[in-house]
Structures are given as structure tokens and as C-alpha cells.
């Protein structure tokens, strides 16, 4: 009787433990220690599996039942942003050089004076520089004389100066010439007022002479130059003690 009770007690204990293991097994697929909550291993270090074990869904790497997921490939380095080269629009500088007709021509003439040749040669050297983009030669006259006559005279003078500059090395492709006659005469009213102040005692000839002298700035050739602004890169100087 006693032996049968002991066996019954052992059987109940086994059932109880089996129920507990089964409860754990349905979740883990392995026999799990109730105390440490870790998978139980045998003497060979192997994980104990139970009847509920499914290798495909429950296999563990530490038990040798699953392959560790490969390390994720590192994210590739982002490609550097392309370097955008912004072409800067060229900067221009405009300049006007006024040449007095008195230094270039005789009164009412369109042939260059001898001294004017030397001045134009120096100017041509400057206009031949590579940064010079365009040269516009404008002929101007004073208001005296007819519009038609002044227009023709201003054109002849502009062409004479332009041709001289070309003969001294200025590329013909960058130079142009135009006559503007008396259209930009600026001294007329001022000079007429000045001559009027001379009074009745001054002869007409003297007044005319004074007027011609006064309006001289209107008799001119303007050389209009457009150049590209060049940026000079100054090299750094190393200062050494000698």
C-alpha cells in the first residue's frame, strides 16, 4: 500500500512537471528552467527540445538550430553632391576718351595733324589689349554750319581716326565709326550768351571768332571703349629672413 502511494505521488509530480513544461514548451519549443527562465541543456551542452519544438519557427541560433541573420550591409556613403560651376557673367567697364578736334584737325578740316599721329599711336596700343571688347569712334561738330555739312564732316573725321587706329594695330573687328554731326553740341547756349555780353562795340568778326573759340569742346572725336574687368590673382609672397 505504501509503495503504491509513493508511485502515485511520483506519477502526479511528473504529470505536474509535464504540464508545466508543456506550458512553457508551447511558447519556447525548448525545455525552459522554471527558476532561471533559461533553456535547459544536457551534459553535452545541447539544448533540450520538447515535443512542441518546430525548428523552422522556433529554432534558436544559440542552440545551433538557426543561422544567425547576416549583418546588414552598411548603408553606402551618399554620393558627393556634384560641384556646380557657376559661370560668372563678365563684368564690363565703359570709358569715353574725348579728343579735341583742335589737336586732331585744322579748323573745318578732316586730315590729321602731325602731332595727332603720335597721340593716336599711344591710344592704339592701349586699345589693342585683349581685354578691350569694343571701340566706338564718334565724330562731333559744333552748331555752326548746316546740319548736312556738319553730319558729313563728323563722319569723315570719325572714319579718319578709326582707320588710323586700325593701321596702328587695333583689330578692325572691334572698332566702329559713326558721325553724329551737331546732335550732341552742348556749348551752344552758353557760348551765345557769353558772346552777347561783349556788347555792340565788338565787331561781328570778333564776336564770331570768340564764339568759335568758345564752342571748341563741341568739335571733338569721342572714343568709347568697353573692356572686360580682369581679376588679377596676386601670388602670396613668402617672407624669409635673409
From Swiss-Prot:
Subcellular location(s) per record: Cell outer membrane
Pfam families: OmpA
Effect of gene knockout: No visible phenotype when deleted in strains CCUG 37602 / M1080 / Serogroup B / Serotype 1 and 8765 / Serotype 15.
Any one GO biological process: monoatomic ion transport
PROSITE patterns to which the protein is assigned, alphabetical: OMPA_1 (PS01068), OMPA_2 (PS51123)
Signal peptide start-end: 1-22
SUPFAM superfamilies attached to this UniProt entry: OmpA-like
Domain notes: The periplasmic C-terminus (residues 87-242) probably binds peptidoglycan.
Protein's name according to its UniProt entry: Outer membrane protein class 4
Species of origin: Neisseria meningitidis serogroup B (strain ATCC BAA-335 / MC58)
Gene (UniProt): rmpM
